[in-house]
Structures are given as structure tokens and as C-alpha cells.
């Protein structure tokens, strides 16, 4: 009986050790995946404004042409959310560029940001809706 108890204890210890190694490896793999792949980033209007001032970014307005013409962030490129499908948008030729995406309220910008990531863009930041933009807007014409 003592021998069976020792055998059981050794087996349990081996099993615990092996499963611990497997869990540790899975965590490492997940961390590597996260650094290798592009990820969705939600930021505030203030953070987006700071990024615009301090680095080279492409500001992407995913609203309709009418909404864009009514007032948009200066230098924003119009790429309506509905136009983003399985093809890379012509207005966004560089998949390595840092994209700052916005719409009116934040719903379309999230959807568009996720579609752009799926198309292979690497650095996509959603800063929500223009209704939360405390800075100046420009109008065409």
C-alpha cells in the first residue's frame, strides 16, 4: 500500500509539473502573437490630437461625403466605412502608416478600424466620434 501511495504521489507531481510547463508555454506563445499581429487601439480625442502634433499620421474620416463636407478634421482623408471591403482603399496605400480613424459617434470608426486591420494595416487607432472632438474642424469651400 505504501508503494502505491508513493507511486500515486510521484505520478501526481509529474503531471502537475508537465501541465505547469504547458501553461507557461501557452502564455509565452500568446504574448508573441500579440506583438507579431496588429491590434485594435481605442484612444481619446486628446491622445489622437497629440499624435497628430508629434508624429506622421494619416487621419481617416469614415463618415459619408455629406458629413465630411459639413466639417472634418484638417487634412483628414475621406474613406467612407461602407466603402471598406476586401480591397485595400486607394486613399490608404501604405499599410505601415499610422492611421487615426474617426466617424460621427464612434460606432463606424470601430467597425472601420477592425476592417482595416483585417486588410493588413498594422497601426490603426480609433479615436471615436467627431462629436467628442474639442478642436477645430474645417469645411470644404
Where do the language-model regions lie?
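Rhodanese-like catalytic fold shared by cysteine-dependent sulfurtransferases
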Residues: 3-9, 17, 21-46, 51, ...
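Structural scaffold elements adjacent to functional motifs in cytosolic proteins
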Residues: 59-61
Amino acid at each position: 500500500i505504501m508503494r502505491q501511495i508513493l507511486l500515486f504521489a510521484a505520478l501526481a507531481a509529474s503531471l502537475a509539473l508537465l501541465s505547469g510547463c504547458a501553461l507557461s508555454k501557452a502564455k509565452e506563445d500568446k504574448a508573441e502573437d500579440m506583438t507579431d499581429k496588429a491590434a485594435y487601439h481605442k484612444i481619446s480625442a486628446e491622445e489622437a490630437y497629440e499624435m497628430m502634433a508629434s508624429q506622421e499620421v494619416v487621419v481617416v474620416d469614415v463618415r459619408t461625403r455629406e458629413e465630411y463636407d459639413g466639417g472634418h478634421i484638417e487634412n483628414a482623408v475621406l474613406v467612407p466605412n461602407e466603402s471598406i471591403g476586401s480591397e485595400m482603399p486607394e486613399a490608404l496605400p501604405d499599410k505601415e502608416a499610422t492611421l487615426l480613424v474617426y466617424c460621427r459617434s464612434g460606432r463606424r470608426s470601430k467597425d472601420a478600424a477592425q476592417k482595416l486591420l483585417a486588410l493588413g494595416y498594422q497601426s490603426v487607432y480609433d479615436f471615436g466620434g467627431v462629436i467628442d472632438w474639442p478642436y477645430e474642424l474645417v469645411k470644404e469651400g
